[in-house]
């Protein structure tokens, strides 16, 4: 009787182990992030997701190897978490919310500030990049946006906006017609 109980416990633990150690999709998600240029937006900043889909279409026309995709976070908390931990390299927000993210104020007050560099403006929206986003990728992305500007309503170079100091170095190189930088592996 005791042996049967022990055997049944072992079997139950074994099945629980199998269930919880099954192949998780986490590895696939990391691979997906490496294969695609993800541009994050959020439901809580209403105009960002529809515009991110337009932006992705233009980028994929101009730079198909980027394999750009729109990604949408549910909340500002999730946006800050993914962006500040370098899990999402690009983020499209309204100007007001972009400033709040960088300063850790407004809707991001509870979650803290996050470093960001500016890639491009689209009317009231701003495309931000991680400071660690490679200069070469920022150059390629900026070049694709410039080439597709006619399809991007309100696209405005950061060079045309006064008082902008945090432009991504790769973006500056592209806008100043400098040659594409080499990819530096860290």
Summary of predicted features, one role per range:
Residues 11-21:
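Bacterial N-terminal signal peptides
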Residues 33-48, 68-71:
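Short, well-ordered beta-strand elements
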Residues 41, 119-137:
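A bilobed periplasmic-binding-protein/Venus flytrap-type ligand-binding module shared by bacterial periplasmic
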Residues 48-64:
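Short, polar/charged alpha-helical segment
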Residues 64-81, 162:
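Short helix-initiation/N-cap motifs at beta->coil->alpha
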Residues 88-110:
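A ligand-binding cleft/hinge motif common to bilobed small-molecule-binding domains
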Residues 105-121:
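Short beta-strand->loop
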Residues 151-186:
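An extracytoplasmic/periplasmic, membrane-proximal ligand-sensing/linker region
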């Amino acid at each position: 009787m005791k042996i049967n109980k022990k055997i049944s416990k072992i079997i139950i633990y074994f099945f629980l182990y199998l269930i919880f150690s099954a192949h998780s999709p986490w590895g696939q998600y990391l691979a997906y992030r490496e294969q695609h240029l993800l541009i994050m937006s959020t439901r809580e900043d209403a105009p960002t997701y529809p515009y991110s889909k337009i932006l992705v279409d233009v980028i994929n026309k101009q730079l198909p190897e980027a394999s750009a995709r729109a990604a949408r976070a549910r909340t500002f908390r999730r946006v800050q978490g993914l962006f500040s931990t370098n899990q999402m390299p690009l983020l499209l927000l309204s100007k007001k919310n972009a400033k709040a993210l960088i300063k850790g104020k407004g809707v991001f007050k509870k979650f803290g500030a996050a470093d960001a560099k500016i890639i491009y403006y689209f009317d009231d929206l701003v495309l931000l990049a991680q400071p660690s986003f490679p200069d070469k990728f920022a150059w390629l992305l900026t070049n694709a946006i410039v080439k597709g500007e006619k399809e991007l309503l309100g696209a405005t170079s950061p060079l045309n906006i006064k008082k902008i100091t945090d432009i991504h170095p790769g973006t500056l190189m592209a806008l100043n017609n400098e040659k594409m930088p080499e990819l530096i592996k860290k």
